[in-house]
């Protein structure tokens, strides 16, 4: 049974994030977009320590002008200890900008995640990644490269159980992520970014999890582009495939 206390924590978390988003959006002179993300995230358990993730995503960005992205994130994960994951992969991103040149990005990444389960199944984690971005303008046949560092700190909180791994578990999560592009040449113009998310998920069983989050991000820009605020609405279907 859900306790009033745990639901209260969830509502307080979401309310705080919404209020912060409103505060960021009070300056009407800032460009503002709505983004809608849909993900199918299958993960294959190869062995006790190795797994392979192949997240596929479509992102609709309601900016001026409108554009969409198709993303594929094949990633290997090695877990030498229960509290640490090492990741590496090559991501692929196609951007259709309609009124501008289409883009294709190849993005090798490496990362390390450290995590700790604390009181009542609450899990804290820190996920640090380095990306090498290779972006090609498909109309002009130009290629730009940039390195980007990103760091995400997250808390996951089970609601109706004291573990995140039990069947029929509801849980909430919140995180903040910082992005720092070290070479501000890639065409998206994003020199720095902060992203805040809060969401809820239902772990049906060891195979299926359904996840929704609301987030907002604030982006600083190079190339003389203005600061922008973005609202994000995301739904993910997480599919754990046994060996």
PLM segments and residue spans:
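Residue-level signature of outer-membrane beta-barrel architecture
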Residues: 44, 78, 114-116, 157-159, ...
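Short loop/turn motifs that connect adjacent beta-strands in outer-membrane beta-barrel proteins
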Residues: 46-49, 83, 117-124, 159-170, ...
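Transmembrane beta-strands of outer-membrane beta-barrel pores
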Residues: 56-62, 90-96, 116, 130-134, ...
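N-terminal signal peptide c-region/cleavage motif recognized by signal peptidases
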Residues: 20-22
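Start-of-domain marker
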Residues: 27-89
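Transmembrane beta-strands of outer-membrane beta-barrel proteins
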Residues: 52-54, 84-88, 122-128, 149, ...
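Outer-membrane beta-barrel "beta-signal"
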Residues: 112, 155-157, 229-243
């Amino acid at each position: 049974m859900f306790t009033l206390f745990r639901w209260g924590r969830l509502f307080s978390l979401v309310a705080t994030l919404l209020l912060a988003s409103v505060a960021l959006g009070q300056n009407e002179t800032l460009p503002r977009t709505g983004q809608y993300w849909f993900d199918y995230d299958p993960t294959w358990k190869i062995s006790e320590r190795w797994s392979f993730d192949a997240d596929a995503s479509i992102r609709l960005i309601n900016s001026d002008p409108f554009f969409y992205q198709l993303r594929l994130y094949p990633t290997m994960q090695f877990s030498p200890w229960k509290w640490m994951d090492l990741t590496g992969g090559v991501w692929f991103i196609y951007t259709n900008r309609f009124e501008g040149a289409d883009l294709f990005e190849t993005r090798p990444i490496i990362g390390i995640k450290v995590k700790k389960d604390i009181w009542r199944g609450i899990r804290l984690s820190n996920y640090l990644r380095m990306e090498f971005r290779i972006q090609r303008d498909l109309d002009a046949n130009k290629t730009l490269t940039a390195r980007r560092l990103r760091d995400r700190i997250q808390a996951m909180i089970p609601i109706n159980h004291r573990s995140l791994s039990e069947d029929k578990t509801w849980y909430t999560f919140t995180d903040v992520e910082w992005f720092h592009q070290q070479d501000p040449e890639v065409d998206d113009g994003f020199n720095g970014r902060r992203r805040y998310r809060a969401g809820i998920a239902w772990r049906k069983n060891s195979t299926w999890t359904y996840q929704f989050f609301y987030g907002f991000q604030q982006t600083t820009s190079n190339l003389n582009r203005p600061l922008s605020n973005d609202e994000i609405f995301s739904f993910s279907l997480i599919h754990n495939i046994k060996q």
